[in-house]
């Protein structure tokens, strides 16, 4: 009887875990984030400047950078799941297939249209220009996430070994904060902006762990009181 109860509890973990909804609708949320980013870059304001809707439309357009943060958070979640079920070699192969190959193809097409030099093309596809010149030369987000992908298995290794995952996470964020303070006046401004998004990605990784390994219940009986149980 006790074994049946334990088995039922195990099989119902995902249903009980309120945070698992984030992973369930992760692709939908990523699509929303991508559209928000696109809106920031391409959307033309269509409402009258004197109307309330203009203020709202302009505000939503201006904070479209939040789409990048949403995307990184959800990417961190997905990578935890990926490393849980795949060896590191398979993990890297999947990133190569899904991200790097399409990036190289797109860069090759644009290089012909815009008449890039061979040196410029090489620097773009290898990420050299991302670190040495400017991150915004071409599809900056791809070299950014590739950088995160490269170091994620290392982070995962130490994260899994840590007895207290929350303390490990807090320690990592504190180390990042010290690095950020020291690099603020030394690092290029655009590159520094990218490093300031690392905590968002790592937070997504922690949420991935909570989604997969823990039972999270979020209850709100009072509009002014939110109860979180782990």
Describe the function of each predicted region.
Residues 149-174, 209-229:
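Solvent-exposed interhelical
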Residues 24-82, 99-107, 131:
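Functionally critical transmembrane alpha-helices in membrane proteins and complexes, commonly lining
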Residues 15, 179, 183, 194-202, ...:
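Alpha-helical transmembrane segments and terminal signal-anchor/GPI-anchor hydrophobic tails
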Residues 44-50, 113-119, 179-187:
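Juxtamembrane "helix-exit" motif on the non-cytosolic side of transmembrane helices
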Residues 2, 46, 64-95, 104-120, ...:
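Juxtamembrane transmembrane-helix termini
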Residues 15-32, 163-164:
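N-terminal membrane topogenic signal
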Residues 56-68, 128-144, 182-203, 230:
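Interfacial loop-to-helix transition and helix-capping segments at the boundaries
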């Amino acid at each position: 009887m006790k074994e049946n109860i334990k088995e039922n509890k195990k099989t119902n973990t995902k249903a009980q875990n309120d945070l698992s909804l984030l992973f369930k609708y992760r692709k939908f949320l990523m699509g929303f984030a991508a559209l928000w980013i696109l809106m920031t870059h391409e959307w033309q304001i269509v409402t009258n400047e004197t109307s309330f809707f203009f203020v709202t439309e302009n505000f939503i357009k201006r904070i479209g950078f939040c789409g990048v943060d949403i995307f990184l958070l959800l990417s961190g979640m997905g990578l935890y799941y990926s490393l849980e079920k795949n060896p590191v070699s398979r993990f890297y192969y999947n990133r190569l297939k899904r991200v790097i190959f399409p990036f190289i193809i797109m860069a090759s097409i644009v290089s012909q249209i815009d008449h890039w030099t061979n040196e410029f093309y090489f620097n773009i596809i290898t990420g050299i220009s991302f670190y040495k010149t400017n991150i915004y030369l071409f599809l900056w987000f791809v070299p950014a996430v590739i950088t995160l992908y490269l170091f994620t298995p290392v982070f995962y290794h130490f994260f899994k070994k840590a007895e207290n995952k929350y303390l490990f996470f807090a320690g990592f964020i504190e180390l990042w904060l010290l690095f950020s303070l020291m690099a603020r006046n030394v690092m290029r401004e655009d590159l520094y902006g990218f490093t300031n998004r690392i905590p968002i990605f790592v937070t997504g990784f922690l949420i991935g762990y909570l989604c997969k390994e823990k039972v999270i219940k979020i209850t709100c009986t009072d509009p002014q009181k939110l109860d979180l149980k782990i």
